[in-house]
Amino acid sequence: MEISWIGVLLAFVAGMVVAMAWYLKGAIADAWEGLTGITPEKNKPVRTRNLILLAVSNAATTVGLAFAVGLTSAATGNDSVWMAVVVGVVAWLTLSASTLLQHNSFEQKPLKLTTINTGYQLALFLAITLVLGLF
């Protein structure tokens, strides 16, 4: 099994770009703020901590997906970009989306918030595995 650590680094950067694009400004960010009540002003005191947590969690996700893609590639003999993306979709569906849906349902969070956050996770997993698949 081979892992391109340059690919991992670039996939991590892609994941951070997705996070910033999803939650920083625009219609999705505005809807998320409205549903959570978390405004840029409320976020300011914990912004650095949250960015560190985002980077650590995205790094863990990227490395985990790199190993999943590498193992799947080694097991199947298929190292295509599409195989990597399929690994990302399967990982998202079985680990991320299902878990977030459970938590948000029991916490009685709005379906729109679940959709926004689950959509972000899908975009994140797709971006990461697309880049990994290219390397």
Task: Give each language-model segment a name.
Residues 1-135:
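Juxtamembrane/disordered regions of integral membrane proteins
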